[in-house]
């Protein structure tokens, strides 16, 4: 998954934080729950996790189990709801699916870093103006 993550970060042009994490995006419900089960709290400051062994590591199974994250364009096109910025430790990345132009991934843990209130809070190609 190391090479897959490098491809994801390179193609998505997402920032790496001073402490070695990277930032990515996720679309959640209006009340900050995950869109799949509506049971995981994705409000700012929350840490969301699941056992790593339950995250599908097969990149050719593109829609599968795991905590999903994405590049800005992919996440923002994922229907209605709130767009949140995730802070992810690279060690928690399990797979980058092969057929989405390296724009989405699966991990076992992330921290909800912030909420994107409008595109005005973004600069560049998906970079967050403050992190």
Regions picked out by a protein language model, each given a short descriptive name:
Residues 1-62:
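ADP-ribose/NAD+-binding catalytic cleft of ART/PARP-like enzymes
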Residues 128-131:
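C-terminal catalytic or substrate-handling cores of phosphate/nucleotide-
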Residues 51-121:
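ADP-ribosyltransferase catalytic core
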């Amino acid at each position: 998954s190391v090479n897959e993550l490098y491809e994801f970060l390179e193609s998505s042009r997402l920032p790496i934080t001073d402490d070695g994490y990277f930032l990515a995006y996720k679309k959640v419900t209006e009340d900050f729950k995950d869109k799949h089960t509506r049971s995981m709290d994705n409000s700012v400051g929350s840490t969301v996790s699941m056992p790593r062994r339950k995250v599908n590591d097969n990149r050719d199974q593109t829609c599968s189990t795991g905590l999903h994250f994405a590049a800005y364009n992919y996440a923002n096109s994922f229907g209605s709801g709130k767009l949140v910025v995730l802070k992810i430790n690279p060690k928690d990345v399990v797979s980058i699916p092969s057929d989405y132009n390296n724009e989405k991934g699966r991990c076992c843990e992330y921290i909800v870093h912030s909420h994107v209130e409008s595109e005005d809070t973004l600069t560049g190609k998906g970079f967050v103006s403050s992190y």
